[in-house]
């Protein structure tokens, strides 16, 4: 017993997080395989159940079966629970239940909780976890109440379940919808393109869920005093605003020409918000221009913010790389923002994460394109959606073969935990050698 305990203690935080996600995915897949999880009462093939489970836990939204028509009420509930666990994080959920039971949280557990939500320090982590969980449920409840009249007006009493499901799915940046029928599969929110309440509610839920729990805490503590926010919170909020407004303006002038002005504004904003990293869509994505799809791919790869329900390489990674490039152009040794320097190791970690995401995105797209005989651009859209844990699709995912689906499963999983794992691997267990190799310059650019 002592040896088992010793081994558990040796597991680093990032390994616990990675194994926690994997455990929930496998358990969810086994449950979804059961006949009572599908409306037809049949056993779902393991690879399809695994794909759905991975997509839910990694809060992606890519599916191989229509969620609304294929899965039973029980199956949809299981998917929703996995979305909630995946959005909050396995460690955060486990820690919250431990606190509810009155158990004392050890220092090692607090350290793991700190890593799971990207907190700057261990102190106050229990208070922060309570704040996150309570805030999550409150925001999801508000989102549900706002959407209730619209969904109940169309679906009657079933509208309560519809509002709850889509509120949680939006806040957790999952992108799963249950609006599909046997006659109209995979509709997402295309039927609500001109409905202001649903559009605005979903967009706000996505944004709030995607800015990160620490940013919430900063806003809650300092209210609207922007100057008092942490540098990270400032960078997140400004970067998020830029990555919403700039693409929305581009989409407005390049797409949706046939829509009335109000719907065109809503459609442009919605398609700008959702690629980071929610996966809902109100517009016909294949009909959008090639340049708009390229911008959406970039947005999908960037994703949300650290310590949030969103995936992707993160807004801070993107911002650090841009700031670093500006510092080079200005012939400065360090990247600077809001009167602070950004540490060189942070820039290296950002570059490492960005390279990893781009390699996964590109290699995955090439393999799927080769295996399926599909255009590379279409396959790259799907792999960006998978590795960014977004869920947007040009409609090819349900038709892909098992090999291609397995590739997307791996991309979704690595997209959710891969960047985190690489960063922790880079900053932990460093072997500082006294002797160093000779330095030699290499020309770049």
Where do the model's predicted regions map?
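Membrane-proximal intracellular helices of multi-pass ion channels
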Residues: 1-445
